[in-house]
């Protein structure tokens, strides 16, 4: 695993010479920072296919996960305002009373959920200093056995990645680069992974290498740092994250 990530990183450095204007990719399959969503969306008709390696601290429920895993997702942007994403997160069998013993330690199932974002105001729209404003939701339904119309997402139900949010983003030209300031109010009322309150993030793209986007955020729960590296005219994006400065997650995205 470490060798694979090293090869991808070296490839990004060697090939990442094309100037781009990319957005960071949230580990949940939506445009954002690292864990925290922001108010940005992709360009109209953008199609993204991505996958993440997620450390166990990045996951919302220890009883269901409690182990490192992977996810993969499909994301589509419509009308230059709307993002819709479908995310699948792999699950290993474990001795928690649900899985048969033959599945212990093996990837045997996956959690599936949708996420969506509506950008109400674009940055600079109506007024040159106007920040972007967006609202959205992740994992808005729950259920089992084929019943996914249950809206009881709070508490301890199956909607492990549930949250709704209101986000604002604004970018500034500063010496030697472009600075992004992001604020997001999140709410989920979950027992297992509470994300309730105001999160914030800072992104910085240096002028000397615009393929690189440095990120720090607080998602209301943890302080995270990371970077996004873009290559091949922004068709490939590699994301590296240190949750709480020590737990590694990484992503590769194609669009």
Task: Label the model's feature ranges.
Residues 8, 15, 31, 49, ...:
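Feature targets compositionally biased, intrinsically disordered low-complexity regions
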Residues 197-241, 249-253:
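Outer membrane beta-barrel transmembrane domains
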Residues 79-81, 222, 245-247:
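A generic structural motif
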Residues 89, 138-140, 184-188, 219-221, ...:
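Active-site beta-loop-alpha junctions enriched in small/polar residues
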Residues 1-30:
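Cleavable N-terminal export/targeting peptides
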Residues 152-219:
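Detector for outer-membrane/organellar transmembrane beta-barrel domains
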Residues 28-32, 37, 45, 182-186, ...:
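Glycine-centered flexibility motif
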